[in-house]
Every structure is written in structure tokens, then in C-alpha cells.
């Protein structure tokens, strides 16, 4: 295969694998030390180890080409390069180094290309500076900045830029923007912003780099409450103990949510179904990932129903990791859990915060008609930032379509989505995203501040003020959303029970009805996973 990397120089390696003619795949958009490849033939991820190897080879020389003496030295960048301990300057050794770090199981028999004559073996330029075919040139956007800022901060300071690495006028311009005209370490000082499409105001978030400064005072939250005097355990402690005993997972704990004490003591919990390992790698999320996670617990629906029936809560949010490895994305597992919870506690209000199920209509239908009360799917960010923030399989328009399908399959459902702010979006983009959600019949929207869970996730670009959140809330309400929750500490499931019930009560008041919900009815066939949606009945206001 011919791989095109978004590195400081156009790079491609031809893999003449046995069993077929050479194939080509290309990719761009380096993030978190890995490049995403996209083509009809191949969709693969470049490991961090290879990114560091290639960049260290380029950084070893001011000219971007390695001499024999430079090639013979050992490459030592810590455990990330443990699989490639030395590099030789001969073509065969270079091919072996690339192959072993890229895909150890692949057969990389040649790195010779058909575009230019083979350079002399005294340089590795034939690997690192190969010019791709003209047909693919427009797909490449080399950038020292984008690569450097995708690395952990300690490694950024050890990478040295040189004008010769990029070559040409465009390369010199990028070099000057990163390191200055004389050349210096990129690790010193503040990292420059990355403007997109010529706009100085449009920036993208970067892994390991936060430009927002210290957290403002409005992010201070109270610690979880202990038991009150005379009581054995607080509501928070009771939930925590029961969750541990049933071997269940909550997003409140996994994501280190700052609102856990307020939500749990307020009677709202968010459970994670389908395990704790995700098949996707969104750059804002700290949940562990794997292409082949363990199978879900077949008894999990029963465990959840048993737990919820015992808890002193009136609203439960059930979310999950993405399970692209399952034929239905886990929709059937979700639906059965909803049915069993409703059977065990009919008064329970259930919100399901789910993935896009890869856009599979039947999966959306299965869950939408399972008996849940709120169908939630988060669009997460604005259209421009989606490729930088979410996994490559998560598409902006696909998320909108899934929310619209859920409403079509069950018009009585409340649909809900959430937007994270502080990732470099503009106010116009936020308003456009709100409009897109409303145009697809989304009923409820929440807006909250993005907070980086660990240093391995995207940095915070800015802390949005409470006044700005209030402005977005007013705009969203004018658009016709049935309920809007907007604030720095608001999360998709933050105090969801209170928000949801408040919306119902306010809606009843507007229509001249009683201030309380009188009855919740459920008719569902648990065995077939089919049933009518929960309907709320309220009495007319007495004359």
C-alpha cells in the first residue's frame, strides 16, 4: 500500500504485499499522535510510535535527510519507541523499521516507488521525502504545527524544526510560523494558534495544550454530601454502595464528572451499559478504547432493573460506550434493559443517551419503540470541529439524521442533544448548530463547558462565561426548544430528572392544566421488546 502521512514532509511508502497488486490509501488530519486513513480500500490508524519515529528521523538533520553516521545511532524516545530500538540507513533496514512499527503482521517487501528514481542508499530521503502522484497531491496538507501540538508537551520541546524539512515556499512559511526564521525548538513559549481556511478567529483544539488558563471561580462545586446527623448513609453513599455491589458502571464516576454529588443526592444517576470499553476514540473522552472489547454482560439488563427498583431515584439516565463490533450497535441490549426497568418500576422516567448506531435505521427504531421517555444523542460540537473532536466514524449529519429518525419512529418521544463549548467554536457556529438541531425536531438541548478529563485529551481553548451561556439559552428558547439547560457545569445528564419534570410542569401550566403529573401508564411486551411509549396524562384544570 502507499500511505500518505500528514507529517512535516509528504511521505509515502509502497507496500508490495503478496496476493495482489499494490494498493494505495491516504489520510490527513493528524491528532493525538495518530493519523486517520480513509479510502475505499483501507481504513487504518497510524500508531504514535511511527509518528515519533518518522519525526525524530527528520529532526535529526537540518536538511531533513539523514547521513550514514546519523542513521547508525540509536533512537531513544522512551517506551513509545520500545519496538524500534535502532535505525539503519540502508533501504532494506528502513523498510523493516517502518514495517515493524506500522503493522507488525503486514508483509512490507518494498519501499521503492514508481514516481521518482531510487535515491542513493546514503540517505533516508527516499522514504521521508518521496513526492506522491499528482492525483493525490491535493489530499495532503503537511504541517509541523499540527504534528507537534498532537504530541505530549514534554516531547514538544525536544523536536527541532529546520527550513529544509518542509521545502518550497509553503514549507518555509510554515517553518517560519512555527519556529521563526532562524530555527529553534518548538517547545519553548506558547503554542501558536492554528487558523483554518484563512480565518484568524477559527481555531481548533489540540491534545495536550490548553490555552484557556486557570479555571474560573464559577467551576467550584461542593463535595458529595456525607450522611446527615442521625442517618446511617446519605443518598450518595447508598447509590455508590449498591452500584459497587452489582458490578455496574456509571458515567458519573468513569468520566470524573464534577456534578456527581449534586446529581446523586438529587435522585439522578447515569449508568453505562454494554461494558466500559468503547470501540471509538473521540478526543475529548477518557473512557478506554479497543477495537474488540469484551462481550456485554448478558445479565446486565436484569441487574440494572433490580438496582433501579431499589434505588431512591425517580429518573435514570442510561448511556453506553459505542459498540460498533455488535451487529445492531447494542440497540437490542438497550431495549431489553428499558423494558425490564419499566416492568420493575413503572413510575421511573428513563432517558437513553446512545451512540449513532452507525446510522442503522432498524437499531434506532428498536430503541425508539422500546418504552423509553427521552431519546438522547449528543452532537457534541459544531460542524467545523467535528473531525477534530469526535471519532472519524461520528459524522455531524449522521447525528442529526439519527435524532430525526427517532422522532419519526415515535413522535411522542422527547429527543435531546448536547453541545460542548470551549473548544474553539464561534458564536455563529453555535447558533447554526442549535438551528440544525431544531430543524431536525430535537426537543431538548443542553450546553455546557468542555473540561479536559486528563492531559491526554483535547485542551480547553476558552472558558465560556455564564453570561454567554445565558445568551445561548435565550436564543435556543426563541427557536422553539421545549427545554434548554445552558451553563458552565451543565452536562447532558446533569440534574436531568429535575429539568425533565420542570419542563413537563411548565408545559402543563402553559396549557391550563394541573401543576403535577397525575399518572404514568406503560403498556409494553417485555418478551418481544416491543411496546408503546410511556404517555403522560394530566387532568384539565378545574373551572
UniProtKB/Swiss-Prot annotation:
Its main location: plastid. [4Fe-4S] cluster 1 binds at residues 252, 257, 263, 493. Its cofactor is [4Fe-4S] cluster. Its EC number is 2.8.1.8. HAMAP family: Lipoyl_synth. It holds the Pfam family Radical_SAM. It is found in: Plastid, Apicoplast. Pathway: Protein modification; protein lipoylation via endogenous pathway; protein N(6)-(lipoyl)lysine from octanoyl-[acyl-carrier-protein]: step 2/2. [4Fe-4S] cluster 2 binds at residues 278, 282, 285. Belongs to the radical SAM superfamily. Lipoyl synthase family. The gene is lipA. Gene3D superfamilies: Aldolase class I (3.20.20.70). The lineage of its organism: Eukaryota, Sar, Alveolata, Apicomplexa, Conoidasida. It catalyses: [[Fe-S] cluster scaffold protein carrying a second [4Fe-4S](2+) cluster] + N(6)-octanoyl-L-lysyl-[protein] + 2 oxidized [2Fe-2S]-[ferredoxin] + 2 S-adenosyl-L-methionine + 4 H(+) = [[Fe-S] cluster scaffold protein] + N(6)-[(R)-dihydrolipoyl]-L-lysyl-[protein] + 4 Fe(3+) + 2 hydrogen sulfide + 2 5'-deoxyadenosine + 2 L-methionine + 2 reduced [2Fe-2S]-[ferredoxin]. GO terms for cellular component: apicoplast; mitochondrion. This is Lipoyl synthase, apicoplast. GO terms for molecular function: 4 iron, 4 sulfur cluster binding; lipoate synthase activity; metal ion binding. Residues 264-482 form the Radical SAM core domain. Binds 2 [4Fe-4S] clusters per subunit. One cluster is coordinated with 3 cysteines and an exchangeable S-adenosyl-L-methionine. Residues 1-63 form the signal peptide. Keywords: 4Fe-4S, Apicoplast, Iron, Iron-sulfur, Metal-binding, Plastid, S-adenosyl-L-methionine, Signal, Transferase.
Amino acid at each position: 500500500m502507499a500511505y500518505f502521512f500528514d507529517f512535516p514532509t509528504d511521505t509515502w511508502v509502497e507496500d508490495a504485499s503478496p496476493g495482489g497488486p499494490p494498493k494505495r490509501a491516504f489520510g490527513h488530519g493528524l491528532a493525538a499522535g495518530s493519523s486517520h486513513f480513509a479510502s475505499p480500500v483501507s481504513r487504518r490508524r497510524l500508531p504514535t510510535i511511527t509518528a515519533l519515529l518518522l519525526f525524530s528521523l527528520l529532526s535529526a538533520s537540518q536538511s531533513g535527510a539523514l547521513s550514514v553516521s546519523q542513521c547508525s545511532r540509536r533512537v531513544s524516545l522512551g517506551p513509545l519507541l520500545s519496538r524500534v530500538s535502532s535505525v539503519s540507513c540502508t533501504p532494506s533496514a528502513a523498510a523493516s523499521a517502518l514495517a515493524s512499527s506500522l503493522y507488525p503482521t503486514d508483509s512490507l517487501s518494498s519501499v521503492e516507488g514508481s514516481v521518482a528514481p531510487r535515491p542513493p542508499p546514503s540517505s533516508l530521503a527516499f522514504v521521508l521525502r518521496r513526492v506522491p502522484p499528482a492525483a493525490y497531491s491535493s489530499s495532503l496538507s503537511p504541517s509541523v504545527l499540527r504534528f507537534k501540538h498532537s504530541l505530549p508537551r514534554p516531547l514538544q520541546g525536544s523536536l527541532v524544526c529546520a527550513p529544509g524539512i518542509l521545502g518550497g515556499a509553503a514549507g518555509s512559511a510554515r517553518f517560519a510560523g512555527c519556529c521563526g526564521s532562524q530555527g529553534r525548538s518548538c517547545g519553548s513559549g506558547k503554542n501558536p494558534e492554528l487558523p483554518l481556511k484563512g480565518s484568524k478567529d477559527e481555531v481548533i483544539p489540540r491534545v495536550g495544550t490548553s490555552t484557556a488558563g486557570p479555571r474560573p471561580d464559577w467551576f467550584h462545586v461542593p463535595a458529595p454530601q456525607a450522611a446527615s446527623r442521625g442517618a446511617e448513609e446519605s443518598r450518595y453513599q447508598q447509590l455508590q454502595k449498591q452500584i459497587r455491589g452489582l458490578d455496574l458502571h456509571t458515567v458519573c464516576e468513569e468520566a470524573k464528572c464534577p456534578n456527581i454529588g449534586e446529581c446523586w443526592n438529587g435522585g439522578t444517576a447515569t449508568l453505562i451499559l454494554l461494558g466500559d470499553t468503547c470501540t471509538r476514540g473521540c478526543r475529548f473522552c477518557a473512557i478506554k478504547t479497543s477495537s474488540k472489547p469484551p462481550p456485554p454482560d448478558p445479565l446486565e439488563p436484569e441487574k440494572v432493573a433490580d438496582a433501579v427498583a431499589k434505588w431512591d431515584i425517580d429518573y435514570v439516565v442510561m448511556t453506553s460506550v459505542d459498540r460498533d463490533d455488535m451487529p445492531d450497535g447494542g440497540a437490542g441490549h438497550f431495549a431489553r434493559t428499558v423494558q425490564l426497568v419499566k416492568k420493575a418500576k413503572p413510575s421511573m422516567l428513563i432517558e437513553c443517551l446512545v451512540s449513532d448506531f452507525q446510522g442503522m435505521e432498524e437499531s434506532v427504531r428498536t430503541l425508539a419503540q422500546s418504552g423509553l421517555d427521552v431519546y438522547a444523542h449528543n452532537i457534541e460540537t459544531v460542524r467545523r470541529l467535528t473531525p477534530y473532536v469526535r471519532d472519524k466514524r461520528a459524522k455531524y449529519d449522521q447525528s442529526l439524521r439519527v435524532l430525526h429518525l427517532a422522532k419519526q419512529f415515535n413522535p411522542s418521544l422527547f429527543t435531546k442533544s448536547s453541545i460542548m463549548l470551549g473548544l474553539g467554536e464561534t458564536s455563529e457556529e453555535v447558533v447554526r448548530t442549535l438551528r440544525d438541531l431544531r430543524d431536525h425536531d430535537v426537543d431538548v438541548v443542553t450546553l455546557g463547558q468542555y473540561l479536559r478529563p486528563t492531559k491526554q485529551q483535547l485542551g480547553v481553548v476558552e472558558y465560556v462565561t455564564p453570561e454567554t451561556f445565558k445568551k445561548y439559552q435565550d436564543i435556543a428558547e426563541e427557536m422553539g426548544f421545549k427545554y434548554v439547560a445552558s451553563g458552565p457545569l451543565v452536562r447532558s445528564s446533569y440534574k436531568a430528572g429535575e429539568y425533565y419534570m420542570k419542563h413537563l410542569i411548565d408545559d402543563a401550566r402553559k396549557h391550563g392544566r394541573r401543576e403535577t403529573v397525575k399518572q404514568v401508564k406503560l403498556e409494553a411486551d417485555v418478551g418481544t421488546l416491543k411496546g408503546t411509549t410511556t404517555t403522560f396524562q394530566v387532568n384539565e384544570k378545574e373551572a
